Amino acid sequence: GGGGGTRYGGGGGAGGYRESKCSTTSGCWTASPRATCVSLSLVPGAVPVTVGAGGAGSATQASGGNATLGTQGSTSTFSTISSAGGGGGSSENVNPGQPTVRNGGAGGSGGGASYNGCGPGTTAQGGAGNTPSVSPAQGFAGGNGGPTSGYGSGGGGGATAVGTNGSTPNVTGVGGAGATNT
């Protein structure tokens, strides 16, 4: 997953979720809504697997410092299948000479946005999910930042749902739901 933002920061997005289940070949479990029926042929021998690391949270800001995004998580791979790391959550910008709002970062699922510090008519946008694009989608967008007076930031996106938007008073959005296999 992606790292979260600091100082009214948005939540980090979940890493991309990929799943395959073909009822005639895949066993007796219930697949999530994200499953596809595309098989991957494997031959005996080594299969390259990389487990991507989670992203670091954004750095704490000094007085007058610029905002930073949480770091995007690293890509995970199994053979030829890749799942993107989650997008980083955004942070409020405490530099008075700069805009005080940041958008969430894109990724497997998008990072949530910081609250709307730029005044009426502007909204910090949650980061895009399913980046890079695959079908079915590997994740969803992060939530938008809340209104100026609310200090509510967006939740990070999940495997099966978007993160919810921040709202007033001081309500941070909930992260998007994950996927369940049974």
State what each model feature region is:
Residues 1-182:
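Glycine-biased low-complexity/repetitive sequence motifs
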